């Protein structure tokens, strides 16, 4: 009995121990000084009865990344270069909290990578060959990735299998790059001031490590240029006269004072960030710990312990000394979105040959939404002679995110998504120009013809004679998808203006609005794919998705009203669609609801519509605009409406089902005539309307992009 009691006591104690471990955030320290500070943090949090934190020590950021991925630790603060590494397989970590810099009045979650030199010299950024260089550390953002990416054209490096470190070792006469292999690349460690095993170490045991160390390397006269961040000079030199002895090298091969960093920097890069596991990452616990820690031990909060401070002789332990707080990173943001396409691509390019970099720059990667679009895209890619390749995602917003990260380059979007993409920094490049219903003859000037927009309409069965715009409340509704123009933004924007209520799931009795919560009324009418899977997903796996899907929802008597565009009914009735559900449908069996309470035939949409909507448009990043335009205009000359290889080989504007990649009634992709921002393209009235509607609910991607603009 006594033995049983002891066993139970032991198991209870073990359970309490494990429960404590589950509640506690295990912080990973990358050096002994960091571990010492971490234990001080732990003791001070305990004193104020704050959230528990425990500490483990590893010898490098990569070891901490591995420990977190293996669930042996929970969090570590990383520079952007290691955020990139942490986001890769097999680790798949993501940033959960960003360090905030600046002031309380002007906080920012970015900093500037700069090249600092002593005044008096005459060399410029393009004249560094043969000089001596000081770096914060191998693979770090300001000290390695950004400057080496900037200098790559001068390095005489053709790419792998030779490591880029070899080219850098040849380029500079001597360097200090903490973390470099001093056996393989002795020149990269020649300037370092550490002794014995600590020479060139990736830790504070190397005096020239990190920002202050690299700047010290320059100040001591060891190096000619230091690659650091803009704040280092101000943090390490409080005297203005001393700061005046240094200046910045600018990308335009001029020099500027150190306080002109906004006009003279190598790159603007995201803050250091705390990373955690993408799945079961204790994000809430980590944020609660950081929030309370900054409240108790932030700037000027406590004389006993400084969260953003380091002991004399040390710098930036656990967090940057210049940080003023943390900002929680929205859950939609992974490492690629956090770093941005420019920096993300720059790091990748440091690992590719010149030929690979040039080939990627020339190629357009199209993003396909869902399996059906991907099949069509792969067919296009196979005939494009390498000009176009494909990536895919399950939703439009996921595709927009791939374009933002540089993993894809372009896609054609409905106006509602053009708004989202524009808010995230993408731009319209070409617009879908639609065939005129009045004429079937091709327009030789289609590419230069200004786009007119299309009509968003509410379609009902002609037999439902009592149904008008004024009586749609409580009926069953069919929508193209949430956030799309004709199917959501316009009708729901009108209803919001009428009712002032955001409870759209209560306005109609049941709906199919792909992209909604599958458990809500807004998905009740959706049917998914042939196997009954993928119900309410915002792609073509949901049979009631898109213009054709929403009309099918009405035609099959699931819904009472369908919100589509004016040509949708024409394209799917009177023999224009041979699919089983549509082949017997008659145009005359449907009618339009007018805003004045009247009803009219479908052919009279000009005088009975909800609003004029902007045409779909191709969007991309600014860096890809010209190449994308060149490729698409060439591709439509071959595969467009009257292309040389359509219909014999492939047609861009025809689909196995309906409206895959582009709308099937697209006549051509047309120039924008100056409407090259989302605001200009969509027009002020539409932008104002959708901005108003977003008060009801924003999307995770919009929330993420709002954060990234800070």
UniProtKB/Swiss-Prot annotation:
Hydrogencarbonate 2 binds at residues 480, 484, 486-487. Residues 20-29, 39-49 are annotated as: Bactericidal and antifungal activity. The record marks 23, 32 as: Interaction with PspA. Transmembrane segments: none annotated. The keyword Iron applies. Poly-N-acetyllactosaminic carbohydrate moiety seems to be needed for TLR4 activation. Fe(3+) 2 binds at residues 414, 454, 547, 616. Residues 39-49 are annotated as: Interaction with lipopolysaccharide. Keywords: Antibiotic, Antimicrobial, Cytoplasm, Disulfide bond, DNA-binding, Glycoprotein, Heparin-binding, Hydrolase, Immunity, Ion transport, Iron, Iron transport, Isopeptide bond, Metal-binding, Nucleus, Osteogenesis, Protease, Repeat, Secreted, Serine protease, Signal, Transcription, Transcription regulation, Transport, Ubl conjugation. One of its GO terms (biological process) is positive regulation of toll-like receptor 4 signaling pathway. Its EC number is 3.4.21.-. Residues 25-352, 364-695 form the Transferrin-like domain. Residues 20-24 are annotated as: Critical for glycosaminoglycan, lipid A, lysozyme and DNA binding. The active site is at residues 92, 278. Residues 46-51 are annotated as: Involved in glycosaminoglycan binding. Disulfide bonds join 28-64, 38-55, 134-217, 176-192, 189-200, 250-264, 367-399, 377-390, 424-705, 446-668, 478-553, 502-696, 512-526, 523-536, 594-608, 646-651. Residues 1-19 form the signal peptide. Residues 21-22 are annotated as: Important for full bactericidal and antifungal activities. High levels are found in saliva and tears, intermediate levels in serum and plasma, and low levels in urine. In kidney, detected in the distal collecting tubules in the medulla but not in the cortical region or in blood vessels. Detected in peripheral blood neutrophils (at protein level). Isoform 1 and isoform DeltaLf are expressed in breast, prostate, spleen, pancreas, kidney, small intestine, lung, skeletal muscle, uterus, thymus and fetal liver. Isoform 1 is expressed in brain, testis and peripheral blood leukocytes; isoform DeltaLf is barely detectable in these tissues. Monomer. Found in a complex with LTF, CLU, EPPIN and SEMG1. Found in a complex with MPO and LTF; interacts directly with CP, allows Fe(3+) incorporation into LTF and activation of CP ferroxidase activity. Belongs to the transferrin family. Transferrins are iron binding transport proteins which can bind two Fe(3+) ions in association with the binding of an anion, usually bicarbonate. Lactoferricin binds to the bacterial surface and is crucial for the bactericidal functions. Has some antiviral activity against papillomavirus infection. N-terminal region shows strong antifungal activity against C.albicans. Contains two BBXB heparin-binding consensus sequences that appear to form the predominate functional GAG-binding site. This is Lactotransferrin. The gene is LTF.
């Amino acid at each position: 009995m006594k033995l049983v009691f002891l066993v139970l006591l032991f198991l209870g104690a073990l359970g309490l121990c494990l429960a404590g471990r589950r509640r506690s955030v295990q912080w990973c320290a990358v050096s002994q000084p960091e571990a010492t500070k971490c234990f001080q943090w732990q003791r001070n949090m305990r004193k104020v009865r704050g959230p528990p934190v425990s500490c483990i020590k590893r010898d490098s950021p990569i070891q901490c990344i591995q420990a977190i991925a293996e669930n042996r630790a929970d969090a570590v603060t990383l520079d952007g270069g290691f955020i990139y590494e942490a986001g890769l397989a097999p680790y798949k970590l993501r940033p959960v909290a960003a360090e905030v810099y600046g002031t309380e009045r002007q906080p920012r979650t970015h900093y500037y990578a700069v090249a600092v030199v002593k005044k008096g010299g005459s060399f410029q950024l393009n004249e560094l060959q043969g000089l001596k260089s000081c770096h914060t550390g191998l693979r770090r953002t300001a000290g390695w990735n950004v400057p080496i990416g900037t200098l790559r054209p001068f390095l005489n490096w053709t790419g792998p299998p030779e490591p880029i470190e070899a080219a850098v070792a040849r380029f500079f006469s001597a360097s200090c790059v903490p973390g470099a292999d001093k056996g393989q690349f002795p020149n990269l460690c020649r300037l370092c001031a550490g002794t014995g095993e600590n020479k060139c170490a990736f830790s504070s045991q190397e005096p020239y490590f990190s920002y202050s160390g690299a700047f010290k390397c320059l100040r001591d006269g060891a190096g000619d240029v230091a690659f650091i961040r803009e704040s280092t000079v101000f943090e390490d030199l409080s005297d203005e006269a001393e700061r005046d002895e240094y200046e910045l090298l600018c990308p335009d091969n001029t020099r500027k004072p150190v306080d002109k960093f906004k006009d003279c920097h190598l790159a603007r890069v995201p803050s250091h960030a705390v990373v955690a596991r993408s799945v079961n990452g204790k994000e809430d616990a980590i944020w609660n710990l950081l929030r309370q820690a900054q409240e108790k031990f932030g700037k000027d909060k406590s004389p006993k312990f400084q969260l953003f401070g380091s002991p004399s002789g040390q710098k930036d332990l656990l967090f940057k000394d210049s940080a003023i707080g943390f900002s929680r990173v929205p859950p939609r943001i992974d490492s690629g979105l956090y770093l941005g396409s420019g920096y993300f691509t720059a790091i990748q390019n440091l690992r590719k040959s010149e030929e690979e970099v040039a080939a990627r720059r020339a190629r357009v990667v199209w993003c396909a939404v869902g399996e059906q679009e991907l099949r069509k895209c792969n067919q296009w890619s196979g005939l494009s002679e390498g000009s176009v390749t494909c990536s895919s995602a399950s939703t439009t917003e996921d595709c927009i995110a791939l374009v933002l990260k540089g993993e894809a380059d372009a896609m054609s979007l409905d106006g509602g998504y053009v708004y989202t993409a524009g808010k995230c920094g993408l731009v319209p490049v070409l617009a879908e120009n639609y065939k005129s219903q009045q004429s079937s003859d091709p327009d030789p000037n289609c590419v230069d013809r200004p786009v007119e927009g299309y009509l968003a309409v509410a379609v009902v069965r002609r037999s439902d004679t009592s149904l008008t715009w004024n009586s749609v409340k409580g009926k069953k509704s069919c929508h193209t998808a949430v956030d799309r123009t004709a199917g959501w933004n316009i009708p729901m924007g009108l209803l919001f203006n009428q009712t002032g209520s955001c409870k759209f799931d209560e306005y109609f009795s049941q709906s199919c609005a792909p992209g909604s919560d599958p458990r809500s009324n807004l998905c009740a009418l959706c049917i998914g794919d042939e196997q009954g899977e993928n119900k309410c997903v915002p792609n073509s796996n949901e049979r009631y998705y898109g213009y054709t899907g929403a009309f099918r929802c009405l035609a099959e008597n699931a819904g009472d009203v369908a919100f589509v565009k004016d040509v949708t009914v024409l394209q799917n009735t009177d023999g224009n669609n041979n699919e089983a559900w549509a082949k017997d449908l008659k145009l005359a069996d449907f009618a339009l609801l007018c805003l004045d309470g009247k009803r009219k035939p479908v052919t009279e949409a000009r005088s009975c519509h909800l609003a004029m909507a902007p045409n779909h448009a191709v969007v991309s990043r600014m860096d890809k605009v010209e190449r994308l335009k060149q490729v698409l205009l060439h591709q439509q000359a071959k595969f467009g409406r009257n292309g040389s290889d359509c219909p014999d080989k492939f047609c861009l504007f025809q689909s196995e089902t309906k409206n895959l990649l582009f709308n099937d009634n697209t006549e051509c992709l047309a120039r924008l005539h100056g409407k090259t921002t989302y605001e200009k393209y969509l027009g002020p009235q539409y932008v104002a309307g959708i901005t108003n509607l977003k008060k009801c609910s924003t999307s995770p991607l919009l929330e993420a992009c709002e954060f990234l603009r800070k």
